[in-house]
């Protein structure tokens, strides 16, 4: 056993010369395989004269407090081992061995010295207060809570340098929401640009920095959103800068006062207005622009598709046929119910129209010349025919004039028959169309050729051609 212990000196005189100071006890080489029992204690007593150590005063509380602990101590000086010391020298060594002291840093540890002392009562009295002071510092588990606390505190301190505090965080509102809140809280419901800036900075500390960036965004939001209206200063309010207010129709952008997300975009409603601030009269701007060509139409300046979209309601007033296959029967029906304007259109148009065969398949392939279409279109526009809404290019309501609304049911039945019949098929005689037969009318009137012309222009056929 003694061969495993390597000390600087083998004699007691050498040992005392190395450690002349009685208040210093340095640990040397770890002692392994410390057996429990008094046999090891006797061997250690023979190896080191304990009389000199006890008489030198190492067992006093002062000596314990001044002694240096080796960092290599493991769980040997745990509170359980220290608590086993007052039971006697043999019990103390047994408890230390049971605690797993395989890597004790010193043979002359405080527990070993306390158990090896010649006066057990005095050594235990001195070890009592020392054990209380040793518990928090020598136990390995004592460092865990304090280290965790320090790491947690250090991490929190580092996080504060990288993260803003809660009041200085970026608010979850868009610029449109901020402007709307600022304008709505004003007593006059209007603010200048500088007043909007100031209100945002007063309420949200986040916007007190990088002012140039977000102020540019505020200006862009005011300019490019139709819900904000610019109001000029009145003479009784002199100053610099115009006022900004909310559009009267934009009150429902935010639902229940929640400014986190807009319920609907007011820009879509305001976009048709081509004029300035108010959007009340601007909602009708697009239909009026589409119906703008009220004078004579130049056939060279407009494409056939453009003429077909803009003038179909007025051109087809005298011939309310929904499809190209309705040529002979529709002519008889329209001839019986045509108005005065329709009869006036037949005289110049019939003189310039080419003669076409009476068969239903012959006139479909015949192209329509623009020279005939131009005077027809111009006379219709000069007549001042009413304009209709363009829901569908060949809607029955759009192709019908106001004087022919009483025949609406007849045309509905006729339209249903055309959707399920081929071009050359004969129509049922039960339809209330009336008039002469197909063979009695050889020339086809030009007003009935309009659906045939537009059928080739539109990419999507209206009738079923299978």
Swiss-Prot record:
Residues 269-358 are annotated as: Disordered. Pfam families: Forkhead, Forkhead_N, HNF_C. GO terms for biological process: alveolar secondary septum development; anatomical structure formation involved in morphogenesis; anatomical structure morphogenesis; cell differentiation; chromatin remodeling; connective tissue development; dopaminergic neuron differentiation; dorsal/ventral neural tube patterning. The lineage of its organism: Eukaryota, Metazoa, Chordata, Craniata, Vertebrata. GO terms for molecular function: chromatin binding; DNA binding; DNA-binding transcription activator activity, RNA polymerase II-specific; DNA-binding transcription factor activity; DNA-binding transcription factor activity, RNA polymerase II-specific; double-stranded DNA binding; protein domain specific binding; RNA polymerase II cis-regulatory region sequence-specific DNA binding. The modification Phosphoserine is found at residues 303, 327. Keywords: Activator, Chromatin regulator, Developmental protein, DNA-binding, Nucleus, Phosphoprotein, Repressor, Transcription, Transcription regulation. PROSITE patterns: FORK_HEAD_1, FORK_HEAD_2, FORK_HEAD_3. InterPro entries: Fork-head_N, Fork_head_dom, Forkhead_box_C, FOX_domain-containing, TF_fork_head_CS_1, TF_fork_head_CS_2, WH-like_DNA-bd_sf, WH_DNA-bd_sf. It is found in: Nucleus. Residues 273-284 have a biased composition (Gly residues). Its main location: nucleus. GO terms for cellular component: microvillus; nucleus. Transcription factor that is involved in embryonic development, establishment of tissue-specific gene expression and regulation of gene expression in differentiated tissues. Is thought to act as a 'pioneer' factor opening the compacted chromatin for other proteins through interactions with nucleosomal core histones and thereby replacing linker histones at target enhancer and/or promoter sites. Binds DNA with the consensus sequence 5'-[AC]A[AT]T[AG]TT[GT][AG][CT]T[CT]-3'. This is Hepatocyte nuclear factor 3-alpha. Binds DNA as a monomer. Interacts with FOXA2. Interacts with NKX2-1. Interacts with HDAC7. Interacts with the histone H3-H4 heterodimer. Associates with nucleosomes containing histone H2A. Interacts with AR. Interacts with NR0B2.
